[in-house]
Regions:
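Extended, hydrophobic alpha-helical segments in both membrane/secreted and soluble proteins
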Residues: 282, 310-314, 325
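Active-site metal-binding core of divalent-cation-utilizing nuclease and nuclease-like domains
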Residues: 296-312, 316-319
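Catalytic cores of nucleic-acid endonucleases
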Residues: 329-388
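Short, surface-exposed, polar/charged, turn-prone segments marking secondary-structure boundaries
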Residues: 324-327, 351-355, 417-422
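Beta-sheet entry/capping signal
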Residues: 293, 313, 320-324, 387-391
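Acidic, metal-dependent phosphodiester-chemistry machinery of nucleic-acid enzymes
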Residues: 1-276, 280-288, 292, 305-306, ...
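Active-site beta-strand-loop-beta-strand hairpin of nuclease catalytic cores
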Residues: 316-324, 328-334
Length: 438
């Protein structure tokens, strides 16, 4: 099948309300059912589906669904297998394309999860904890960052418990388990188990199945409203369909960014606010492992009265090594995710190359630290004897950051080391100081 034919078929299937059951089956296979696959092996790569692919299918459903259009339950297995095959064929088509634009699309879309769910939620609380940001989110959007962890935990527990209970009860009676109901939390459960603040978070991240989509999806690269609002509110007070828990954790972290962009409270200040927050978060991560010789926001000036040459965002030294972190809050734009070469170049320049070159300038100055007033003032004249490394950090998950850094390294004097805040957090979570420096 051609790419157009695949999209046409997926659009047709997703126009059925019954397609929600296919989404439920996929969610079951890729989460609860994964234990069986790991024990008994997988038939082929097409037996697995990424979270990004499930998001795309859910986005098609909320866009195309006709509520009174259904198919017989006996057809569920056939259509589920067909959807797996269609998505596998679509991926294969992108793998076969040789142009750079589509190769980047393949990297961005099929890269997989960029952080753990608990990281998304934990850093959401930290990213938006500044009073000004916190108040806008809570007062204008009824989104309290202090209850994100408890909300996600309760959602996961509710789904897990009801699936476990239904599997046991239905199996004993040889009854059918609806995959849509399995991932749907009833309104009475929401009211009983969740606090008013937690209910507001759920509501803020919900999309009514009868709602209107602002931007229609034509292909996997298009903006997908489901990613922003991954809790689907089913009609007739049926409940909240939480088919992708991973998407909910990502939305808790990233959807507030879009709200803040739309707010009139910031103007052009949001970028600088995010930059300051990014530096503080990197500093917090570093200080978990290194208690001494850790510095942040150090300006580099030749003399007391001269202009600033550059500045060090975060730095630490350990034994004979020193690490310079340059932190950026630049995100990969939607246009880049669509494969636009000029946009990819621009995003890479602002998020990675600028940070890398700024870091190199810092390293150059630090190798001659005794010549710089500000470094002597901060008792950093000793760093000239260290082996210095330069690392770029992005505040948000940045799809394709490893690939883009690798490709750009060929244009640089020294290799580019770039990662997201979540990657850095994982490294400092898993390893001790000696291992981190090594």
């Amino acid at each position: 099948m051609s790419e157009t034919e695949i999209y046409d078929r997926l659009n047709e299937l997703s126009s059925y309300f019954s397609f929600g059951r296919v989404l439920g089956y996929i969610a079951f296979f890729e989460t609860i059912g994964i234990e069986s696959q790991l024990k008994h092996g997988q038939d082929a790569n097409k037996d697995r589906m990424l979270s990004s692919e499930l998001n795309f299918l859910a986005g098609l459903w909320i866009q195309n669904v006709v509520l009174d259009k259904t198919w017989d339950i006996t057809l569920d297995d056939d259509f589920t297998r067909e959807v797996y095959k269609l998505m596998d064929d679509l991926h294969s088509l992108y793998l076969q394309k040789n142009d750079l634009s589509n190769q980047f699309v393949e990297v961005f879309f099929y890269e997989g999860d960029l952080a753990y769910d608990w990281q998304y939620v934990d850093f959401a609380r930290k990213k938006y904890n500044m009073p000004l940001l916190y108040n806008v989110l809570k007062n204008e959007y009824h989104f309290d960052i202090n209850v994100l962890t408890s909300t996600l935990t309760k959602l996961k527990c509710c789904i897990e418990k009801q699936i476990k209970r239904r599997r046991s009860e239905k199996w004993k009676r040889h009854e059918y388990i609806s995959p849509m109901n399995a991932f749907t939390i009833k309104p009475n459960i929401i009211k009983k188990k969740f606090s008013p603040e937690e209910q507001s978070v759920i509501k803020a991240l919900s999309f009514g199945l009868e709602g209107q989509i602002a931007k229609r999806i034509r292909k996997i690269t298009d903006f997908n409203s489901y990613i922003q609002y991954p809790i689907i509110e089913l009609p007739n007070n049926r409940g909240y369909f939480c088919v992708n828990e991973s998407a909910i954790s990502v939305a808790m972290n990233e959807t507030p960014f879009y709200w803040l962009q739309d707010s009139l409270s910031f103007g052009k200040k949001l970028g600088s606010i995010r930059g300051d927050i990014a530096e503080k978060l990197v500093l917090e991560i570093v200080q978990r492992r290194f208690l001494k010789n850790v510095y942040a926001h150090i300006p580099i000036t030749k003399t007391k009265s001269s202009n600033m040459i550059t500045d060090i965002d975060v730095f630490f030294s350990y034994k004979n090594a020193g690490i310079v972190f340059q932190v950026k809050s630049k995100r990969l734009t939607e246009l880049s995710k669509e494969g636009d070469a000029a946009s990819i170049e621009n995003d890479t320049e602002k998020a990675i190359i600028d940070a890398h070159e700024q870091g190199l300038k810092c390293v150059e100055c630090m190798l001659n630290s005794t010549e710089y007033y500000s470094l002597r003032k901060h008792v950093l004249d000793y760093v000239k004897s260290l082996t210095l490394y330069n690392v770029c950090i992005t505040l948000d998950a940045f799809p394709g950051i490893s690939t883009l850094s690798y490709l750009k390294t060929y244009q640089q004097i020294s290799p580019i080391i770039a990662m997201s805040l979540y990657d850095l957090d994982s490294i400092f979570y898993l390893f001790q100081p000696e291992q981190i420096v090594d």
